[in-house]
């Protein structure tokens, strides 16, 4: 799957404002997806615009709110058309930057305005869309207050039966996303997940096979929730070869889920249920060095993909022959 933002439309060189976008501006993406056996997801885009400011859907200015409400309604309709043509529901993720750099005395007002905007947006039914709302602890320049906090969107998602988006970089550095999976799934039908690697803040470093990603995969697999969690990768890696970044992050995530699927979970649960906690910890540690890498290499070979580190040479060759000449 590929998830794209509303600013990535094929506008034919014409200026099309955010509240004017239509499915026709993304038909070339849909055609490309059909030709490449891909599915598409979509994101409304409230940042980097003259009307962005510090608030969009929670702005005190009704004209500004109405502009972004219209943009988001149109974004959901575009996602709906993607899902219809590709015969697979498209996730539409709603994240806004709204907040305040310094102390605010009107938190309740801003959140009330956001709730009202969301109610108007979701009043339009889109049968081919999976809707999601995404929280964030803070943003650069908006350190003191974020309108769309975790508690706000968690409450809204539960009340309205839509997905909450959990981004690994959008929480406090000591807060682990994997611990939220089982709690959220008891109250929401599905979750949208953004797998990332925050380094001290929401830096979106390239995903690697670290403890956070491994434990996230374990929680999803062990909760039998693979069909309830929509897994998206959210990182940049602009300082290194972009294709290399894609491959490293994608393979790291695949490896994490493979490890979880191969783990001796029945034995681990037997140890836990019988109070044998030394044995549980010992087997958890031993499972880290089990020969899962050989299974992953076999998976790559079966799919005509380079195994182990062989992809390095493949990407270097592509960089030399293709990307360096652009």
Region roles according to the model:
Residues 1, 106-318:
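Active-site capping/gating regions of soluble enzymes
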Residues 1-7, 32:
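Catalytic domains of carbohydrate-active enzymes, especially glycoside hydrolases
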Residues 6, 96, 197:
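Residues that line or immediately flank small-molecule/substrate-binding pockets and catalytic motifs
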Residues 9-11:
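N-terminal, charged low-complexity regulatory/assembly segments
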Residues 14-15:
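N-terminal "assembly arms/tails" that initiate or stabilize quaternary assembly
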Residues 19-164, 267, 283-285:
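Active-site acidic/histidine proton-transfer and metal-coordination neighborhood
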Residues 315, 321-326:
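Catalytic domains of carbohydrate-active enzymes that cleave complex glycans
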